[in-house]
Amino acid sequence: MSETPTSPNQDLPEAPQAGPLSQWLTSQGFDHQILGNDHLGIERLGVEPLALPLVATALKSKGFDYLQVQGGFDQGPGEPLVSFYHLVQVGGSDGASTAEVRLEVSLARDGDLTVPSLYPLFRGADWQERETFDLFGINYSGHPHPKRLLMPEDWVGYPLRKDYVQPDFYELQDAY
């Protein structure tokens, strides 16, 4: 049996290409990572926590003035936690279509889990950032209401983390 020899570069995944928003941000001097497009073709850009308000402000000035969703996800045990903002340009530059972009901030789970809040820029981030804090433990500095939204104030842990250990005992409060 003969196997075809493969070159070492043949097995490497192709690096994501810069999309139009990435190219525009680069031309404006904003540092970011090209994460490629998601399954719907939406451009994903990685930004450092301190650069998030600057990049979001630049995108808002370009017409991405609607925060469709903010959330978080856990990439798995030992992997980073991610806070993301999905921005939409309604009407697009041609007046008819829409454009979308997702900003992602990766945070080492054993490091500083703080991201500047985008509440001053997008008021709709209020409850969404609180929910992400509540379920993943990502803090949003500068948020005007930094408290739990879904879980009781004395709840220990963050239920949507993949390393979360569910408590064995629940004390139910009597409604009467």
From Swiss-Prot:
Its main location: membrane. It comes from the Bacteria. Residues 1-22 are annotated as: Disordered. Keywords: Membrane, NAD, NADP, Plastoquinone, Quinone, Thylakoid, Translocase, Transport. Belongs to the complex I 30 kDa subunit family. NDH-1 can be composed of about 15 different subunits; different subcomplexes with different compositions have been identified which probably have different functions. This is NAD(P)H-quinone oxidoreductase subunit J. It comes from Synechococcus sp. (strain RCC307). The gene is ndhJ.
